């Protein structure tokens, strides 16, 4: 490819690639006839659905009285609200409750925005009850309200996570949280590659990890692919990482719960009802929904196992 042609592409924010099976961008016509609602096999992945239902009642619902988030923007940029188009019902309540329940000493967030407001609110509540939290956000393109400062946000690191030293993630301990909402793209030197191949193996036993926009056991939503041209692949790397992996276990998978136990979600999260339908129409093209009424929750929570860590750290014979 000539230098001039590459320069022209860069000036328009484009990258023209061949339509060929060696390239990661798929041919859209190859999806003709695909059943996007089909539940796909996930091999060695164990969603532990019964455990998730128990965790919902034991660790999440006790904090339901605190889920008093506004359903729409109310003018306060420092207060989390639903219908924001990024971090929505079910995922928000679960994240808030995990922070309140675990009382983490430190949260490292990779990819900041509306989730930062939610995490900061939970961290402030913990601090009021004597459990302060160090909330660090890593974001290459922070929104103005983050740069202005958010109560409860300890530090904002402006830059890609790939530049963050591994020593930072080694500071996380049991009940601490690594909260990830990345580019969702596996490519050379991408944030997803750095997180999955470099950061996750360094985490201490008991650290909780969150990934967003994980739709397993289904594929990415059709409109993400066909309309928004988002050819994400983070989910497939995570499925491969977790398959037959005794070092990590799934704590909560919103999409799997929607697939297998939607009745439980409807009863537990009242705000979920009509959460997509009441959203401003300008945001709906970017927000997934399976029925046109409710948002498609898509958080995945995993944890580093104590048992595996104890075995792996045992001295060699």
Name each region found by the language model.
Residues 1-108, 114-210, 214-317:
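A short alpha-helical cap/connector motif
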């Amino acid at each position: 490819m000539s230098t001039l042609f590459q320069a022209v592409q860069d000036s328009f924010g484009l990258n023209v690639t061949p339509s060929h099976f060696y390239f990661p961008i798929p041919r859209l016509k190859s999806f003709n006839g695909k059943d996007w609602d089909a539940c796909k096999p996930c091999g060695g992945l164990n969603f532990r659905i019964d455990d998730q239902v128990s965790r919902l009642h034991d660790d999440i619902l006790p904090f339901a009285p605190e889920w008093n988030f506004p359903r729409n923007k109310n003018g306060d940029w420092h207060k989390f609200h639903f219908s924001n188009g990024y971090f929505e019902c079910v995922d928000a309540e679960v994240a808030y409750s995990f922070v309140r329940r675990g009382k983490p000493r430190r949260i490292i967030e990779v990819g900041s925005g509306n989730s930062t407001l939610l995490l900061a609110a939970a961290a402030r509540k913990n601090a009021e009850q004597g459990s302060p939290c160090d909330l660090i956000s890593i974001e290459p393109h922070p929104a103005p309200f983050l740069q202005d400062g958010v109560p409860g946000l300890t530090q904002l690191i402006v830059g890609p996570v790939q530049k963050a030293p591994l020593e930072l993630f080694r500071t996380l301990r049991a009940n601490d949280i690594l909260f990830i909402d990345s580019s969702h793209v596996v490519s050379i030197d991408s944030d997803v590659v750095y997180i999955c191949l470099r950061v996750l193996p360094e985490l201490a036993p008991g650290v909780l990890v969150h990934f967003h926009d994980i739709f397993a056991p289904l594929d990415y939503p059709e409109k993400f692919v066909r309309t928004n041209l988002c050819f994400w692949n983070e989910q497939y790397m995570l499925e491969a990482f977790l398959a037959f992996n005794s070092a990590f276990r799934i704590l909560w998978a919103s999409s799997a719960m929607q697939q297998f136990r939607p009745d439980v979600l409807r009863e537990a999260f009242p705000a979920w009802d009509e959460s997509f339908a009441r959203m401003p129409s300008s945001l709906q093209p970017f927000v997934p929904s399976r029925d046109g009424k409710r948002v498609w929750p898509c958080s995945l929570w995993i944890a580093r196992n104590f048992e595996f860590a104890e075995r792996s750290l045992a001295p060699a014979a």
